[in-house]
C-alpha cells in the first residue's frame, strides 16, 4: 500500500497506516514464530504530544509530511490500541541474549521496545517500526519498560545526524512525550521514540539460540537474515560462513566510520550490535570534543571497556561472539559425518573470516583519514602522518571536529594561514612540527589549496551532535519548547555545509559542558 503525501488525504492516512502495520509481509521477522518474540499490547502514555518529527523519514516511508499534525498521531506512535489500531496489529518484543561489558548476561530481550510492524519504503526496501519506551515486556527484568524524554530526544537527533554524516544507522521517525513521571536517578518524564530500520536483529539473537542449544531455531534465524538481507550468501559454498563474513566486514566498515568522526557508542554489548552493520541503540553515546584517545562517553563504563580507542577491538571481539553462535551451522553442507571433524573445520573457517576484520578495518580507516587530510594520492607514510596528528591532538586536548574542519585552511606554501587550527593546540610548537610534515606531504599532491579544501569539507563535518547542544534542546523541551529540537535537527541535516547563520552550533563547547555526564540510565 502506498500513502498519498497530500494534505487533503492526510486525514485518512492513520487508519490505513495502522492496518498496513498490522499486516505482516512475507518473510517478516514476526512470521518466524513464538520462539522468537512475544506479542503484547503497548502501555499507552498519558496525554501524549509530539516533540519531534522527521519529514525525511516520513518521505522514506511514503507518509505525508503533515502526518504528525493529524489527530491520533501521538496516540498511534505510543502504541495506543484505542485509536486506529486493528486487532491483528499486536506489537511484539523479541528475545535475545548477549555479553554485557564482556560478561555473559544470559537472556535479555526487548525490555522496553515494541515492534509495531513494517512499511514499504520508497527505496524498494521494507522497514520495521519499533517503539522504544512502549512499556513493560516479558524481557524487562527489573525495568519499567519506559524511556525518558532526555534519552529519546538524544536518540531522535543522533539517528538522523548519523544518517546525514553518511554512517549506517537506524533512523527515527518521531519522538512523543508525556508528563507521565518516570523514576531514574531523579524524577523525569516518559517518552517514546519510533525507530526505523530494515531489521533489528542483533548478534545477541544468534547467541540466544546458540546458548539454548536450539540449532533448529538458530538456522531459521540465519535463513531469515540471509534470504531477506544477504541473498548473495545463499550462493556461497557455505551460506552461514558467508553470513558471518558479511556481518564481520560490515561491522569493521562501520566502526572505521565511527572513529573517523570521533563517535563513541558507549555500550557496545553484543546485544547492541546489528547483524546488518548499522549503528543501533543510542544510549550514552557522545562525539569527542577535546580529543582524548581514551575518551569514555558512558559514565557507567568505569573500566573504559568502550572507550574511543577500544571500539575497533571490542567490535572484533563481538564478531568472535557471533562466530561462536554460528558454529553449529558452519560447514553443514560439507557432509562431514564426524561431528568433531566438522566442528574443527568450522572453527578454522570461522577464524579465517574473523582474521579479515583488521584487514578490512585498517584500510577503511586509512581511506577515511586520507580523505580528512585532503590526500587524493596514496603514500606509504599517510597512516603515520594521521596517527601523529592524533597524538598531537591528544597531547593538547585539541577539539576533534574543529581541528579536522580547520585543516582545510592550511596552505601548501603559506604557514601564516595555520592560525585558525593552530590556536586549538596548547603545544603549538608540536603542532608546527606536524604542520611542516603535512605541508611536505601536500607538496606531492596535484590539487591546489582551493580544490583540496572543497574535498576536505566534504569529509570533515562542521556540525555534530555535541552533548551540550543536545542538552540545551532537552532543557527547552522539558519546558514544552520544542523549537530547539527542530532547529538542531535541521542543522544536523547539513553537517558539511558552512551554514553561517548557525556558526554558534559549531563553536567550542562552553565551560559548563564539561560537567555533563551520560550513562546507561535512560
Curated annotation (Swiss-Prot):
Keywords attached to this entry:
ATP-binding, Magnesium, Manganese, Metal-binding, Nucleotide-binding, Nucleotidyltransferase, Transferase
Which major enzyme category is it?
Answer: transferase
What the entry lists under InterPro entries is as follows: SelO
Annotated ATP binding lies at 109, 111-112, 132, 144-145, 195, 202, 281
Cofactor(s), by name: Mg(2+); Mn(2+)
Q: Enumerate the GO terms in the molecular function aspect.
A: AMPylase activity; ATP binding; magnesium ion binding
- Active site residues of this protein: 271
Binding of Mg(2+), residues: 272, 281
Question: Which reactions appear under catalytic activity for this entry?
Answer: L-seryl-[protein] + ATP = 3-O-(5'-adenylyl)-L-seryl-[protein] + diphosphate; L-threonyl-[protein] + ATP = 3-O-(5'-adenylyl)-L-threonyl-[protein] + diphosphate; L-tyrosyl-[protein] + ATP = O-(5'-adenylyl)-L-tyrosyl-[protein] + diphosphate; L-histidyl-[protein] + UTP = N(tele)-(5'-uridylyl)-L-histidyl-[protein] + diphosphate
The protein's Enzyme Commission number: 2.7.7.-, 2.7.7.108
Family to which this protein belongs? Belongs to the SELO family.
**NCBIfam families for this protein:** PRK00029.1
The record's section on HAMAP family has: YdiU_SelO
Role of this protein: Nucleotidyltransferase involved in the post-translational modification of proteins. It can catalyze the addition of adenosine monophosphate (AMP) or uridine monophosphate (UMP) to a protein, resulting in modifications known as AMPylation and UMPylation.
Kindly provide the name given to this protein in its UniProt entry. Protein nucleotidyltransferase YdiU
Q: Specify the species.
A: Burkholderia cenocepacia (strain ATCC BAA-245 / DSM 16553 / LMG 16656 / NCTC 13227 / J2315 / CF5610)
* Gene name as annotated: ydiU
Amino acid at each position: 500500500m502506498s500513502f498519498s503525501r497530500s494534505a487533503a488525504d492526510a486525514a485518512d492516512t492513520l487508519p490505513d497506516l495502522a492496518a498496513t502495520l498490522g499486516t505482516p509481509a512475507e518473510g517478516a521477522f514476526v512470521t518466524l514464530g513464538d520462539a522468537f518474540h512475544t506479542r503484547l499490547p503497548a502501555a499507552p502514555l498519558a496525554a501524549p504530544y509530539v516533540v519531534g518529527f522527521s519529514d525525511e523519514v516520513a518521505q522514506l516511508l511514503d507518509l505525508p509530511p503533515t502526518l504528525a499534525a493529524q489527530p491520533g498521531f501521538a496516540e498511534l506512535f505510543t502504541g495506543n490500541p484505542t485509536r486506529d489500531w486493528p486487532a491483528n496489529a499486536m506489537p511484539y518484543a523479541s528475545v535475545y541474549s548477549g555479553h554485557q561489558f564482556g560478561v555473559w548476561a544470559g537472556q535479555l530481550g526487548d525490555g522496553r521496545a515494541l515492534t509495531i510492524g513494517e512499511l514499504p519504503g520508497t527505496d524498494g526496501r521494507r522497514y520495521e517500526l519499533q517503539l522504544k519506551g512502549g512499556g513493560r515486556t516479558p524481557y524487562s527484568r527489573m525495568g519499567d519498560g519506559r524511556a525518558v524524554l532526555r534519552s529519546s530526544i538524544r536518540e531522535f537527533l543522533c539517528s538522523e545526524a548519523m544518517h546525514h554524516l553518511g554512517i549506517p544507522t537506524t533512523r527515527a521517525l518521531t519522538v512523543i512525550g508525556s508528563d507521565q513521571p518516570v523514576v531514574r536517578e531523579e524524577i523525569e518524564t516518559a517518552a517514546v521514540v519510533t525507530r526505523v530500520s530494515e531489521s533489528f536483529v542483533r548478534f545477541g539473537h544468534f547467541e540466544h539460540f546458540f546458548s539454548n542449544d536450539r540449532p533448529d531455531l538458530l538456522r531459521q534465524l540465519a535463513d531469515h537474515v540471509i534470504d531477506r538481507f544477504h541473498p548473495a550468501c545463499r550462493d556461497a559454498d557455505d551460506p552461514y560462513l558467508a553470513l558471518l563474513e558479511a556481518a564481520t566486514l560490515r561491522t569493521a566498515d562501520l566502526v572505521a566510520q565511527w572513529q573517523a568522526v570521533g563517535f563513541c557508542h558507549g555500550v557496545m554489548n553484543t546485544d547492541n550490535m546489528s547483524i546488518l552493520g548499522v549503528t543501533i541503540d543510542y544510549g550514552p553515546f557522545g562525539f569527542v570534543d577535546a580529543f582524548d584517545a581514551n575518551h569514555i562517553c558512558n559514565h557507567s563504563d568505569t573500566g573504559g571497556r568502550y572507550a574511543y580507542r577500544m571500539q575497533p577491538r571490542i567490535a572484533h571481539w563481538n564478531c568472535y561472539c557471533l562466530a561462536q553462535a554460528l558454529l553449529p551451522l558452519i560447514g553443514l553442507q560439507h557432509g562431514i559425518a564426524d561431528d568433531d571433524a566438522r566442528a574443527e573445520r568450522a572453527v578454522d573457517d570461522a577464524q579465517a573470516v574473523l582474521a579479515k576484520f583488521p584487514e578490512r578495518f585498517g584500510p577503511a580507516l586509512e581511506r577515511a583519514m586520507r580523505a580528512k587530510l585532503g590526500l587524493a594520492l596514496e603514500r606509504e607514510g599517510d597512516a603515520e602522518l594521521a596517527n601523529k596528528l592524533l597524538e598531537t591532538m591528544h597531547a593538547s586536548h585539541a577539539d576533534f571536529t574543529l581541528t579536522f574542519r580547520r585543516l582545510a585552511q592550511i596552505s601548501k606554501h603559506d604557514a601564516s594561514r595555520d592560525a585558525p587550527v593552530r590556536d586549538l593546540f596548547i603545544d603549538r610548537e608540536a603542532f608546527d612540527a606536524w604542520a611542516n610534515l603535512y605541508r611536505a606531504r601536500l607538496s606531492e599532491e596535484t590539487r591546489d589549496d582551493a580544490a583540496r579544501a572543497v574535498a576536505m569539507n566534504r569529509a570533515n563535518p562542521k556540525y555534530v551532535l555535541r552533548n551540550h547542544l543536545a542538552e540545551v534542546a532537552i532543557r527547552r523541551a522539558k519546558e514544552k519548547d520544542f523549537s530547539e529540537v527542530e532547529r538542531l535537527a535541521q542543522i544536523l541535516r547539513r553537517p558539511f555545509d558552512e551554514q553561517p547563520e548557525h556558526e554558534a552550533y559549531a563553536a567550542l563547547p562552553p565551560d559548563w559542558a564539561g560537567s555533563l555526564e551520560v550513562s546507561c540510565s535512560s
